[in-house]
């Protein structure tokens, strides 16, 4: 099985790898061609006989298939999406303890921008919009933003309940260790929500008016990650209504955690 598309796609569809191994078929070895950066997430996957970034020298095999073609070949429907969670676990349980912030009971990780690509403008919620939540009591907001956009949080870290973890994210295994300590990950559509969802950490996904295909339309849940929720723009570019919808939902969590 060889990877394709981006990191989020790989994390979302790797759930199908154990299904291949469990098929009622002659015994076979399963090789997974995976980007080096993601390999630490699969160290305990017994279904894989070999995992590597094979590049231009793949092993000799009898069959091969792109990762994202597996749902079609296995006849997946909305009702049969493999949704047992978690299917990824934190491989670095002793890596890093997220610093507690005084007076808070709820840890919320925030991500507001995707990689700078063709869909960048559509997949960015201005940090100023998310900052409208920073006045909420009892919530610690932790910046999980990667890349150059992480610096945008610097204007808000003087607040006692806002802290950037950009310098601690490291590799995907380090990021997983941090995500595991969050109560909620509030993020635009990027690989972070797939990593959180696969670990069964609630991802609250902020979606543009015209979302990616995997999130469907007219629903606030997702069959891919049963513990996660979708918050959709009501008009193109309207992130304010998304934040307005999220605020009372956070208040419910605060009440439950006090």
List the model feature ranges, each with a label.
Residues 1-258:
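Catalytic machinery of carbohydrate-active enzymes
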């Amino acid at each position: 099985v060889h990877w394709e598309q981006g990191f989020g796609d790989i994390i979302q569809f790797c759930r199908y790898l154990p299904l291949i191994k469990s098929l009622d078929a002659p015994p076979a070895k399963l090789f997974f061609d995976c980007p080096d950066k993601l390999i630490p997430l699969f160290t305990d996957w017994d279904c894989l006989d070999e995992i590597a970034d094979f590049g231009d020298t793949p092993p000799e095999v009898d069959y091969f298939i792109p990762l994202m073609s597996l749902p079609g070949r296995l006849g997946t429907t909305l009702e049969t999406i493999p949704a047992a969670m978690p299917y990824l676990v934190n491989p670095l349980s002793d890596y890093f303890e997220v610093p507690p912030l005084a007076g808070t009971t709820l840890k919320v990780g925030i991500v507001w921008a995707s990689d700078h690509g063709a869909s960048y403008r559509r997949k960015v919620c201005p940090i100023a919009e998310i900052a409208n939540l920073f006045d909420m009591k009892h919530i610690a907001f932790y910046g999980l933003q990667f890349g150059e956009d992480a610096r945008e949080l610097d204007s808000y870290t003087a607040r006692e309940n806002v802290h950037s973890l950009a310098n601690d994210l490291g590799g995907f295994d380090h990021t997983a260790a941090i995500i595991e300590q969050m109560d909620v990950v509030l993020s635009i559509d990027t690989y972070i929500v797939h990593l959180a969802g696969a670990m069964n950490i609630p991802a609250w996904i902020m979606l543009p008016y015209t979302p990616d295909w995997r999130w469907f339309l007219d629903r606030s849940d997702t069959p891919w990650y049963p513990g996660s929720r979708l918050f959709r723009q009501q008009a193109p570019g309207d992130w304010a209504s998304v934040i307005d919808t999220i605020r009372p939902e956070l208040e419910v969590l605060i009440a439950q955690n006090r």
